[in-house]
């Protein structure tokens, strides 16, 4: 309750145009560049804070100017909002230089990036060589958050009330904002403990700090506070549901602004009853992904609660069908009235680019189908007005929306007859290799004649300044295509030559011509568009500009064959063709919303299938189709996993199954938990898979080994390349370290299964790290071969 015990509710007879969060990086990546200048020493703390405050004020004014009544504050984090929450709550592990009070920037960035021995870190008492907090995906988005590191008996304290500080900063600009903070149950659920205890056991210790935050906001006359609890979109055990009741029952008993509990990224499902019963003043629901439960929400949420209806897609770049969204709002209003309705995006706009107006090179027809964060605010405001005043005041917006929807629906470029016919002609046989793995392996070994523990790399070599400058020069017209091709060929020649000198068994061409493992392919496929300023935050200062899949996908010409075939012509050793898989291209793009994702993925798979066939015809004996995002595509709810895994596996097989038995299909996956999807990994039917295992010291191989005897082969039937070099670190591992890791792998796998390779591609490493590390890798494989050869029952490959 607010001070004095009087329960406040904002009084209105109209609906409210609301927003849950705004992109924090800036339309031209201002925050990214400020961070990088700060880290390089070219900007001091005051300059960094000033840049962030300028951007924050600009965001607030923009939202007010677009007609948003509930403007969020506290959503701009310097690195990550979950890290901000942990620091605000005093959840800072020992060694990072915090002993009380506000967490310093040195400590904050040491938690985010690891300690680097800088003068600022030394002055703050930060231990050298500390790792960054673990980073993982924010639900099923392409944003990454830092995982709070807690322990049993963790003490929490309010180091600084960030929501209050941001609320006051907005008030100084005459903007009455709605503070945003991550809720206590989601914070704990998303955390990990160092001792294996359940983070939710810390709820009792955490709630007093949240109560203090809310009390101070109430004392500052904040009308509303938005508390995000996105874990309500997950499968929750009963303990977590009870934790919600305890948390909000406790917080409701103290002074607080009106609480809007926000869920997003999916329907509430079986958590609807829990959410509807909580003693809060409003509930935000995702009616884009959770459209099917609209009537259930209307029935379940008490009439005296506010409902925030997320009808504008906050996760994708497509223009809203305003007429359909307005009909949804009107149906809810017919049941509840407009007195306590908010119109909002489905989630924070963090996940979309800032402003479509900056895109001057997009095809006009495609541009008309899109809406970025700025434009989505206009849609929210128009819908709120249409709900209150009817269609007449927004007839211009409705007409423009109708025209865009109609043009997109009727476009022959979006819906291609030839692509539809080809999809319809896909048969089961097209998704099966000609023979089972044992027969394929025999044919491949006869062709390749590889030794035990064959060595290779994952694909890319360092993208040096010279490589990037050549690509940029070609793009700007400062370098001719002929000269660019000459440089690429020279780099490939060098890479082939020194790989041979090192003694690697299966070579790669280095991917010097490629800018990005998705963009490179998307630029050569029909149905893709690319932006100039379509940046979204991946984590910290890292931003990505995902391709936009706007129409049916097809491959008009070979994409990689030229340089792969050239590389193979320079050596007698087997060369790998390198492709990105259909699931990963799908996951790392903005995907069209007018057909199922499965359909789009199948279209991409057919394009990759054509490329695989051309690589095989060009003489490439090994073709690697990378799927690092395979697990990322899993739906939030386990009941939906089976359907996703079925079509994801089918798409990989469609892309790779045309080849002869003697052609080896490899795939690569980055660090992931494989135990719960192991049958699907095996069902992909690749001849070899390479995975990141260095940091886990081969523990990830347990999923592949199953319950088979040590060294006897496991549940994964094919070959495996467990990474023996952590390429995310500049450190060069020794031969003996790699031998030790491979020995651990031999305890889980049969010798014939094991490939020797780095964890991942080497694009971000330097040559002075790559050459000695690969020398040690080859030496480690040779050492194991010698050990095996000395054994009395030495196996053949």
Regions found by a protein language model. Give the residues of each.
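Domain-level signal for soluble alpha/beta catalytic cores
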Residues: 6-797
């Amino acid at each position: 309750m607010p001070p004095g015990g009087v329960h406040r509710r904002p009084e209105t007879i109209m609906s409210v145009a609301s927003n849950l969060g705004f992109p924090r990086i800036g339309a031209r990546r201002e925050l990214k560049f400020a961070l990088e200048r700060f880290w390089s020493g070219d900007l001091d703390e005051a300059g960094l804070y000033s840049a962030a405050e300028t951007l924050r004020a600009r965001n607030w004014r923009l939202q007010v100017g677009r007609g948003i009544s509930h403007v969020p504050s506290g959503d701009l984090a310097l690195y990550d909002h979950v890290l901000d929450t942990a620091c605000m709550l005093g959840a800072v592990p020992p060694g990072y230089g915090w002993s009380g009070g506000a967490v310093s920037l040195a400590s904050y960035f040491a938690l985010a990036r690891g300690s680097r021995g800088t003068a600022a870190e030394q002055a703050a008492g930060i231990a050298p060589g500390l790792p960054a907090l673990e980073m993982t995906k924010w639900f099923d988005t392409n944003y990454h958050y830092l995982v709070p590191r807690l322990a049993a008996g963790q003490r929490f304290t309010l180091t600084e009330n960030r929501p209050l500080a941001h609320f006051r900063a907005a008030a100084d600009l005459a903007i009455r904002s709605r503070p945003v903070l991550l809720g206590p149950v989601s914070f704990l659920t998303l955390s990990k403990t160092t001792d294996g205890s359940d983070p939710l056991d810390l709820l009792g210790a955490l709630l007093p700090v949240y109560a203090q935050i809310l009390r101070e906001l109430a004392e500052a006359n904040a009308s509303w506070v938005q508390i995000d609890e996105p874990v309500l979109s997950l499968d929750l055990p009963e303990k977590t549901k009870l934790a919600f009741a305890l948390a909000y029952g406790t917080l409701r008993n103290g002074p607080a602004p009106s609480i809007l509990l926000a869920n997003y990224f999916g329907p509430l499902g079986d958590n609807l009853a829990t959410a509807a019963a909580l003693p809060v003043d409003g509930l935000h629901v995702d009616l884009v992904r959770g459209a099917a439960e609209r009537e259930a929400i209307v029935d379940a949420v008490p009439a005296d609660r506010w409902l925030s209806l997320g009808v504008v897609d906050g996760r994708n770049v497509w223009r809203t069908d305003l007429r359909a969204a307005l009909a949804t709002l009107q149906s809810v209003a017919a049941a509840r009235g407009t007195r306590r309705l908010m119109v909002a995006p489905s989630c924070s706009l963090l996940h979309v680019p800032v402003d479509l107006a900056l895109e001057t090179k997009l095809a006009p027809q495609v541009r008309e189908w899109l809406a970025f964060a700025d434009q989505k605010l206009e849609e929210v405001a128009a819908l709120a007005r249409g709900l209150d005043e009817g269609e007449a005041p927004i007839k211009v917006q409705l007409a423009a929306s109708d025209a865009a929807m109609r043009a997109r629906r009727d476009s022959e470029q979006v819906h291609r007859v030839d692509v539809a016919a080809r999809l319809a002609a896909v048969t089961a046989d097209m998704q099966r290799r000609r023979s089972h793995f044992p027969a394929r392996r025999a044919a491949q070994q006869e062709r390749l004649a590889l030794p035990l523990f064959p060595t290779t790399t994952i694909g890319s070599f360092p993208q040096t300044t010279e490589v990037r400058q050549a690509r940029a020069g070609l793009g700007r017209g400062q370098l001719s295509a002929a000269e660019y091709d000459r440089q690429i060929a020279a780099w490939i020649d060098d890479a082939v030559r020194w790989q041979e000198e090192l003694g690697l068994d299966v070579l790669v061409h280095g991917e010097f011509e490629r800018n990005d493992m998705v963009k490179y392919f998307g630029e050569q496929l029909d149905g893709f568009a690319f932006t100039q300023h379509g940046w979204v935050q991946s984590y910290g200062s890292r931003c990505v500009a995902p391709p936009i899949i706007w129409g049916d996908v097809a491959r008009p010409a070979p994409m990689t064959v030229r340089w792969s075939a050239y590389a193979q012509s320079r050596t007698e050793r087997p060369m790998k063709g390198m492709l990105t898989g259909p699931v990963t291209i799908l996951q790392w793009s903005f995907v069209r919303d007018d057909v199922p994702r499965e359909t789009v993925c199948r279209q991409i798979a057919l394009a990759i299938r054509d490329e695989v066939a051309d690589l095989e015809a060009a003489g490439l004996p090994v073709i690697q189709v990378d799927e690092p995002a395979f697990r990322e595509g899993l739906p939030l709810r386990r009941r939906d996993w089976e359907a996703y895994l079925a079509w994801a596996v089918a798409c990989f097989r469609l892309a790779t199954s045309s080849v002869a038995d003697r052609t080896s299909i490899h795939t690569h996956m980055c660090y992931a938990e494989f135990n719960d999807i192991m049958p699907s990994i095996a069902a992909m039917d690749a001849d070899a898979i390479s995975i990141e295992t260095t940091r886990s010291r081969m523990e990830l191989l347990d999923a592949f080994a199953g319950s088979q005897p040590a060294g006897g082969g496991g549940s994964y039937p094919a070959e495996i390349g467990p990474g023996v070099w952590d390429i995310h670190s500049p450190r060069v591992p020794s031969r003996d370290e790699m031998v030790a890791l491979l020995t651990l792998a031999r305890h889980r796998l049969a010798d014939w299964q094991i490939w020797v390779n780095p964890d991942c591609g080497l694009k971000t490493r330097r040559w002075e790290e790559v050459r000695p590390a690969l020398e040690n890798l080859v030496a480690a494989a040779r050492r194991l071969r010698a050990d095996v050869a000395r054994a009395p029952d030495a196996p053949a490959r």
